[in-house]
């Protein structure tokens, strides 16, 4: 007997791959017109379960019911045709085509033998109006922001008359304002009777938007609870199988003498304005700020990815030329970029290649071939020292969890023995258990006297991991505070300091450091 309030029932789903049981007897029940969150550490089986629903994988055992009818989708098109859509974390759009082309690709409305562009435009406009999406259907996708691209993908799901929409990490690249807009759209869909399966690592969002939460661990169902009955601590305990009494490791590194000085750094576009600070050996310096504060741009200018306009970068008392990334690398700098999948890894290549790519020239022999024995040895060092969970050095890095991918990205730089590590959103898209491991790793690197500069949009992370926090506002330094003494309120106040300023350059000497 199927519960009529459940739009979707996935019963006793199991899925095996060679040597791995990815799903073990998992049951998921989703009510009509509800937001049902799916949580678990990376590798818990969330994506595999959704791929079984969406027809990408076929379960070895178990049954799927939609509106009481048993279904078994042959592929994703079959799922779409039957009202199941999926908005992937990695947006799959043809960037050089316009918005409405992307919405109706492969199923254009026809007028005789020709595409009915007017109908396509009108249908797109109607969906956008219903969802309060402010995008011109004729705009090229390449001109849209990440948030707008996400909204277009949701509109596409709605255009299939979907009853169930799976959203995989939909807010990973969105601002707070954009998240608020997304939640308004989700609430509209909920009122229309559409069920949302919402996958996210962001517990605050889960508790705000969800009706029910299902938690998975190691391919198994652990619990399904009303969101109103859950706390962050309970979610963490259910996800990792133990209590995390502290979200952050103890800061047991001791900053020493100054190793890096940045004086009046501006970029060639003058988006950075006279940025000045000091970094000590064995110190973790956070960079906080609102969207548009130019935090990433600061790291890119330090690393030579962005052209410097003026100012000095001084390492060990001597000016260094970081005008190009290869020069920055030679000077002992390393950059872990924000968008790991786009700029940090080669997803379709194995771990060993990704581990040595930042230092690949050093592995060439006199004959021009690669020294495979040394590559294997160094790759194993990365796997062991970073505590990477993988069956083999030859495993494709794209198949690993986000946390394990990030460990390899950091490890590849450590093979170069850098002195200054620039980390841009190092825990983005990583589950709570893996985050703790990354924090421990950063702490260990500080104990080895590395100077670390870390950009993060998560205020608790900056306060819990860093020694000091440099706050930026509109491309300027608005303050430098002691992480153990400051508050989120003070950081937010400093983040807004120069938002109304349109001209003039801030004098770095007027900035007070709280140390």
Curated annotation (Swiss-Prot):
Sequence ranges assigned to domain ABC transporter in this UniProt record: 8-243, 254-499
InterPro entries recorded: AAA+_ATPase, ABC_carbohydrate_import_ATPase, ABC_transporter-like_ATP-bd, ABC_transporter-like_CS, P-loop_NTPase
Keywords: ATP-binding, Cell membrane, Membrane, Nucleotide-binding, Repeat, Sugar transport, Translocase, Transport
Catalytic activity from the UniProt record: D-galactose(out) + ATP + H2O = D-galactose(in) + ADP + phosphate + H(+); methyl beta-D-galactoside(out) + ATP + H2O = methyl beta-D-galactoside(in) + ADP + phosphate + H(+)
Keyword Repeat: yes
Membrane-related topology note: Peripheral membrane protein
Gene Ontology, cellular component aspect: plasma membrane
Residues bound to ATP: 40-47
UniProt-annotated location(s): Cell membrane
Gene Ontology molecular function: any one: ATP binding
EC number: 7.5.2.11
Purpose of the protein: Part of the ABC transporter complex MglABC involved in galactose/methyl galactoside import. Responsible for energy coupling to the transport system.
Family the entry assigns: Belongs to the ABC transporter superfamily. Galactose/methyl galactoside importer (TC 3.A.1.2.3) family.
Subunit record text: The complex is composed of one ATP-binding protein (MglA), two transmembrane proteins (MglC) and a solute-binding protein (MglB).
Protein name: Galactose/methyl galactoside import ATP-binding protein MglA
